[in-house]
Amino acid sequence: MRRRDLIRLGGLGLTAGWTLLAACQSAEPTATPAPPTSTAAGAGMAPTASPTPAAAATPTAGATPTVMTRSQSAVVTIYSGRSKSLIGPLLDRIGQELGLDVRVRYGDTAELATAILEEGDRSPADLFFGQDAGALGALAKEGRLAPLPSELLQRVPQPYRSSKELWVGISGRVRTVIYNTERVKPEEIPASIVDFVGNERWRARLGWAPTNGSFQAFVTALRRMRGEDVARSWLEGIKALDARVFPKNSSIVQATINGEIEAGFVNHYYLMRERAQAGRPLPAENHFYTNGDPGGLVNVAGVGVLVTSRASDAALALVDYLLSEPAQRYFAEQTYEYPLLEGVLAHPDLPPLASLNPPALDLSDLDDLKGTLALLQEVGLL
């Protein structure tokens, strides 16, 4: 039985007792500043075989949503800081399986979060899909996200969901230092991310992307863990080393592979995608900090349902699907991120998530996006 049928018939877990799609109204959301893209259901996307057997979590029967039900709609509007190339196929499948008209406004995570804050109660968004916990926390802090059902939250380990039950991680991503293996020896990578500063070995050989949401979340983590002065000094120090500025992580990875730079600060999965596309070994590796260093931050891409959603039941059904085995396998196998649903294994080329020993940091503490943006502006990086 397809997941859409479970919803319509009031089947298992979170879907029990929902009057979701059978009695939906088709009211359009209010006008949006930038028209979202409608994901055409029917494209279809079947995940490839899992590297190893993966068991789906068992939902709690009879769980009911804690989001207030309003006039419901089969149209769900998502503000997505995740790119269309990464999650478009998955959202197409979800729309098809759930019988939803999924409309997506793609953009920069921080900019979309700001747009939601500016739109306030007029926002047409039902669901925010951010590429980092910082933006989700910023929306939660401003009261824009509704509490999520415990049944959904409990599918994800506690470190990767909101301590206030306002957002939930969908996939994990790890900050790494990518380096060119033909020009850099592994032992040359500093023992801490902060030790790059003042090291002339790296002058004009580093790459970073200060406008990237994941980088900004890392800066927030550095502020929380080491303080404002250390974070400012690190930014100023890397800038003083004439680090090359890139628009995004993928550009840093490509430049490292090509030998244009020797190392850069990125998320782990970009190199794996380049390898998959190339179909051959590449002269680059990821250095994982496994000593609790801020440079080894494990962040999440996650979702939250807006308090103003006019389709909150449908939005929750979408979250339910994102935390199902098929969707989690998609993230493991197609985007090379860490699945967060218990029983679904990461790609075999990745170190196990439990072995990474990330910094002891509550991801809910990454909510001061405004402070990080202000700091980046002050040091001339924005």
Label each PLM-derived region with a short phrase.
Residues 73, 80-88, 107-111, 117, ...:
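Extracytoplasmic ligand-binding site segments that recognize negatively charged/polar headgroups
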Residues 176-183, 298-311, 330:
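A bilobed periplasmic-binding-protein/Venus flytrap-type ligand-binding module shared by bacterial periplasmic
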Residues 204-209, 321-344:
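Periplasmic-binding protein-like
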Residues 247-308, 342-348:
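Extracytoplasmic/periplasmic substrate-binding proteins
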